[in-house]
Amino acid sequence: MSGVMCLKASDTWASGIRSQPQGCLGKWRSMRCKHTRMHLAHLGNSRQLISLGPPRTREDGSRISQQVEQSRSQVQAIGEKVSLAQAKIEKIKGSKKAIKVFSSAKYPAPERLQEYGSIFTDAQDPGLQRRPRHRIQSKQRPLDERALQEKLKDFPVCVSTKPEPEDDAEEGLGGLPSNISSVSSLLLFNTTENLYKKYVFLDPLAGAVTKTHVMLGAETEEKLFDAPLSISKREQLEQQVPENYFYVPDLGQVPEIDVPSYLPDLPGIANDLMYIADLGPGIAPSAPGTIPELPTFHTEVAEPLKVDLQDGVLTPPPPPPPPPPAPEVLASAPPLPPSTAAPVGQGARQDDSSSSASPSVQGAPREVVDPSGGWATLLESIRQAGGIGKAKLRSMKERKLEKQQQKEQEQVRATSQGGHLMSDLFNKLVMRRKGISGKGPGAGDGPGGAFARVSDSIPPLPPPQQPQAEDEDDWES
């Protein structure tokens, strides 16, 4: 309303100016400008001006207002963070305890930055708007040669029909192209010659000359260059020491300051820190500082070890479980030979003598021997399993013989089951020889095979005899 009233007032001022004499016209004009400025200043609020505009202007104004409100909220959030940080600083400002602050090397910003959004999100792109097209429905008039000739009589036109002379110059590249933008493009590289004016096409193979063998021989006969002075006059050059431009930092002289070791009640200085002189390398090597280790927290609490005390004496740990009893030897084992039975008997006698030497341990019950039940139970279980002559032990020599016999029997069975003529015969002869020599089983063990019976019926070969002289004479005759 104020804007409308201002316009009406200006109309009345204009009508008053027309009725006034011409001498006061400048004065009224200056007063009208001052009043207009005062009215515009009293409006103040931009929304009233926007509301008076067209709908497009009001829509743009509302979008700008929303953007301003959003920016104002962001500024308010930043102000809250600043006030919070200021409060933390004020809280630790008066304390005298040392505080370690580990700042993050990463800027406190989200991992994915938010893209800037335009305030005209709902506006339609003017490039996509469709504009009305008007199609003119008219046909082109045909060319009238007669009318053209009549007009040429009144309007003389000089048209040159002579063709333009072509540029047949041998030098230069011809006319300038349209895409050249600088003068340097016209010149040859590192020269002042204009390529489009003075440029001659040269054939690189036109002046090629092939060298003959005579010319090559003449070149090789040329003398060598003179030797350097260091060889001809045998002079030695002094080796120049290269200058070192590397900077080596130095500690220099540190002034001695006589100050007390402890300064109490200093404002802004922590009183719970102690600095110890480092005896390692100095500051001259300029080694990078080590990263401090941050404290780690564990949620699991380790339980303390509980020790049982009985009458002020520590109880020993529980004894280990006894081992399983030794497996009994099969009854089908062959009897021991007399050579191996003797040492076993001697060992049994020694065990009997040792058992008679300690009758208390042998006859006493298990609980009386050792009430703690540690190593005694283990030894007792070994004794009961056959430690004192109860076990049917065999010597190592007997075990080796048994294993060897088992391997030979398995080989004979494997070869006899195959049914091959030559293999069966060979194996049977081997077994027969072993039986004769006494190293293996006899021929009457009954092994299977195709020629087992035939080989059994073959008599042994007679011993070789010396031929007599009569036989030799008969053979010669």
Curated annotation (Swiss-Prot):
Signal peptide: none annotated. The gene is WASH4P. Residues 315-327 have a biased composition (Pro residues). Belongs to the WASH1 family. It is found in: Early endosome membrane; Recycling endosome membrane. Residues 437-449 have a biased composition (Gly residues). The lineage of its organism: Eukaryota, Metazoa, Chordata, Craniata, Vertebrata. Residues 1-180 are annotated as: WHD1. Its main location: membrane. The keyword Transport applies. Residues 374-396 form the WH2 domain. GO terms for biological process: Arp2/3 complex-mediated actin nucleation; endocytic recycling; endosomal transport; exocytosis; regulation of Arp2/3 complex-mediated actin nucleation; retrograde transport, endosome to Golgi. Interacts (via WHD1 region) with WASHC2C; the interaction is direct. WASH genes duplicated to multiple chromosomal ends during primate evolution, with highest copy number reached in humans, whose WASH repertoires probably vary extensively among individuals. It is therefore difficult to determine which gene is functional or not. The telomeric region of chromosome 9p is paralogous to the pericentromeric regions of chromosome 9 as well as to 2q. Paralogous regions contain 7 transcriptional units. Duplicated WASH genes are also present in the Xq/Yq pseudoautosomal region, as well as on chromosome 1 and 15. The chromosome 16 copy seems to be a pseudogene. Residues 395-411 have a biased composition (Basic and acidic residues). GO terms for molecular function: actin binding; alpha-tubulin binding; gamma-tubulin binding. This is Putative WAS protein family homolog 4. InterPro entries: WASH1, WASH1_WAHD. Keywords: Actin-binding, Endosome, Membrane, Transport. May act as a nucleation-promoting factor at the surface of endosomes, where it recruits and activates the Arp2/3 complex to induce actin polymerization, playing a key role in the fission of tubules that serve as transport intermediates during endosome sorting. Residues 362-477 are annotated as: VCA.
